[in-house]
Amino acid sequence: MSKTLPKDFIFGGATAAYQAEGATHADGKGPVAWDKYLEDNYWYTAEPASDFYHQYPVDLKLAEEFGVNGIRISIAWSRIFPKGYGAVNPKGLAFYHNLFAECHKRHVEPFVTLHHFDTPEALHSNGDFLNRENIEHFVNYAEFCFKEFPEVNYWTTFNEIGPIGDGQYLVGKFPPGIQYDLAKVFQSHHNMMVAHSKAVKLFKDGGYSGEIGVVHALPTKYPYDPNNPADIRAAELEDIIHNKFILDATYLGKYSEKTMEGVNHILAVNGGQLDLREEDFAALEAAKDLNDFLGINYYMSDWMRAFDGETEITHNAKGEKGSSKYQIKGVGRREAPVNVPKTDWDWIIYPQGLYDQIMRVKQDYPNYKKIYITENGLGYKDEFVNHTVYDDARIDYVKKHLEVLSDAIADGANVKGYFIWSLMDVFSWSNGYEKRYGLFYVDFDTQERYPKKSAYWYKKLAETQIID
């Protein structure tokens, strides 16, 4: 028998400003660190991306036609404040007002993120969120947006605080490209969570209408050998780096003893210290019960083995299967069981991990209120044939994840919506234009859109709520 989803469920599609808009310098937009970083380090740039800056009416019309009733959109901070603070760019304001109006015209509810990996260059180059001044700049920007855009009903402070710390200071695939600095990873996580908490408190104190939450990437971590205490420990430490530290800050308003024990162990082995202040914890504590929802981005799980050597991480950027490597001194190394499928980019396909992660949030953080799956999808080297893509692998991936999501709801989790990554093809931060995720194929030369087989499947799903 087919599984089902609730009648009031959001069947959404996700986007992000820098990955979709293009127009990186148009109409007064300020630079972001990615502009130069992609030029210097990768084989592509954010021009033209999906030209969403001009094509959004087309994309929203397609969304409406294919039953997509929610869209994740992020505001490019540097389109509003080109330097991150100070002078406002009126053309940026006009763009987002027009975009949100089009969403409502098409009956597609916008879920709007304030920061999706794109701190304005002026602030990124002075330390990004490692510089505490930028916490205040972010909160001021957030307050400006809450006032300016009353037409938005769902706000998200940050997209993926974890992968920002990881990408910028551990793997080094995001600007400024620093590697293996675990203290910076945790400090970035912490400072961004303080910024999140201050913005949420301000939103609630200001009496703004609508809801506010945060989007966390939560890849589930398992021990390679569940009977080996050393593997169990490796999975726990890896979970602290990517998930638990951030979830504790979100919903406990502090870091549990067990979390701090793990953090202190990791820093004792790898060096570095954290600056955690009393007033930070006051901010976290004040916001811990104010989050209206948690967005979970879930693509994959990892298995961890105990490991004694030095840290070495190789990022698989070009989809050459088996080329990635991940091992951290004092933590462990990733090694998946042979029978678990992987994508060409070595992303492990394991739907059960989504169920386990949802139930973990429900159990460990009972003040979570409700969950949206804010990103989930399959990156693929799509083959464009007869004006479409026969993306059965993508349909299978999404179907299996929706089935476990249905199980989680049946088992008492409050999950209210799902946003496929991505609505239309966009460029991937560290993989470029070859790795496609969309329901709609984008010809990046002509900017024409073509519905894939998955779009027709998703339309039927949205109409019936039956996962077939």
From Swiss-Prot:
Gene3D superfamilies: Glycosidases. It catalyses: a 6-phospho-beta-D-galactoside + H2O = D-galactose 6-phosphate + an alcohol. Its EC number is 3.2.1.85. It comes from the Bacteria. InterPro entries: 6P-beta-galactosidase, Glyco_hydro_1, Glyco_hydro_1_AS, Glyco_hydro_1_N_CS, Glycoside_hydrolase_SF. D-galactose 6-phosphate binds at Q19, H116, N159, E160, N297, S428, W429, K435, Y437. The active site is at E160 (proton donor), E375 (nucleophile). GO terms for cellular component: cytosol. Keywords: Glycosidase, Hydrolase. GO terms for biological process: carbohydrate metabolic process; lactose catabolic process via tagatose-6-phosphate. Pathway: Carbohydrate metabolism; lactose degradation; D-galactose 6-phosphate and beta-D-glucose from lactose 6-phosphate: step 1/1. GO terms for molecular function: 6-phospho-beta-galactosidase activity; beta-glucosidase activity. Belongs to the glycosyl hydrolase 1 family. NCBIfam families: lacG, PRK13511.1. PANTHER family: GLYCOSYL HYDROLASE, LP05116P. This is 6-phospho-beta-galactosidase. The gene is lacG.
